[in-house]
Regions:
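C-terminal transmembrane helical hairpin of 12-TM major facilitator-type secondary transporters
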Residues: 109-154
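Short amphipathic helix-loop junctions that connect adjacent transmembrane helices
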Residues: 61-79
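A late C-terminal transmembrane helix in Major Facilitator Superfamily
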Residues: 168-198
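Symmetry-related core transmembrane helices of the 12-TM Major Facilitator Superfamily/SLC fold
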Residues: 1-7, 211-231
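Conserved extracellular-gate-facing transmembrane-helix segments in secondary transporters
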Residues: 54-62
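Intracellular juxtamembrane helix-capping segments at the cytosolic ends
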Residues: 152-168
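Transmembrane alpha-helices of Major Facilitator/SLC transporters
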Residues: 79-105
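Intracellular loop-helix junctions on the cytosolic face of multi-pass helical membrane proteins
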Residues: 1-50, 63, 72, 100-105, ...
Length: 268
């Protein structure tokens, strides 16, 4: 299957001139290019990197210490049950992402993804802070945890930065963003595990996970909402500038005005 898909990719038609005009060329970023992008979008990138740091740490703890977080023997779950839960979660996420791929407007997809991941993180917090009140079954709890975490994690590993580059017409590729996310996230995981072993090796994993999940969910939801507000403001500002330039160009062509005169006419 992998070989077949690889062969099919080689059969894709080359982009036409119209395709090149409608899209931004994906190029390899050098050091200067990476720094330029980071400085240009520093507020939103810091928020997203910060949020993904905690999401990756939380996800790794759930995956690596699941048998300590839940009582597997008491719940009666087998390894096949865990596989079925992950399979259902994967299908749900693929369905949602498939629908979003049909949306052509890049900004709408970015907004939808940020709202989606915010709902996911708030779900984590709600379950964590109301764990004893809800009294969810182990299967339901595990399904909701996996769905919320994987929705957030995979949103930024797949769709988000592709649409981000297209929306703001950035000459680059997603490799810089994804590698940075992974590096920060996994370094955070290592740091948490080292601190746990050095300062408090014997802990109640369920209490620790719920406490961390609750506060991480709130912090990440605030970060994602901040990112959404920033992106909307940035998009409107750049769109206004673009419209202004187009009007200036049309004025010059229609009336034969010089740039200086056209600017004067626009001000009036």
């Amino acid at each position: 299957m992998l070989s077949l898909l690889g062969w099919l990719m080689t059969r894709l038609p080359q982009p036409t001139e119209e395709d090149k005009k409608l899209r931004i060329e994906r190029v390899t970023l050098n050091r200067e290019g990476r720094m330029h992008i980071f400085k240009s979008f520093m507020p939103v990138l810091l928020l997203l990197f910060f949020a993904n740091l905690f999401i990756t740490v939380l996800q790794d703890i759930k995956e690596d210490f699941l048998v300590k977080i839940i009582n597997v023997e008491a719940s009666g779950l087998s390894s096949w049950a865990f596989a079925k839960i992950d399979a259902i979660v994967t299908l749900v996420i693929l369905f949602v992402f498939g629908i979003m791929s049909l949306i052509k407007n890049d900004m709408k997809v970015l907004c939808a993804l940020l709202v989606l991941v915010t709902c996911g993180t708030l779900t984590l917090s709600f379950i964590a802070f109301n764990y004893n009140t809800l009294e969810l079954s182990t299967t339901t709890w595990l399904f909701l945890q996996s769905l919320s975490l994987y929705t957030v994690y995979l949103s930024f590993q797949t769709l988000f930065f592709e649409r981000f580059i297209a929306c703001f017409r950035i000459r680059g590729n997603v490799g810089f963003f994804i590698i940075t996310l992974d590096f920060i996230g996994y370094m955070g995981t290592v740091l948490v595990l080292v601190l746990k072993e050095c300062f408090k090796p014997n802990i109640d994993w369920l209490h620790f996970y719920n406490l961390m999940s609750g506060y991480v969910g709130v912090a990440c939801a605030m970060a994602f909402m901040g990112a959404l507000i920033y992106l909307l403001a940035r998009y409107r500002r750049e769109r206004t500038v673009c419209v202004g330039k187009n009007r200036l160009f049309i004025t010059q062509n229609c009336f034969g005005l010089s740039p200086k005169i056209a600017n004067t006419q626009q001000v009036k």
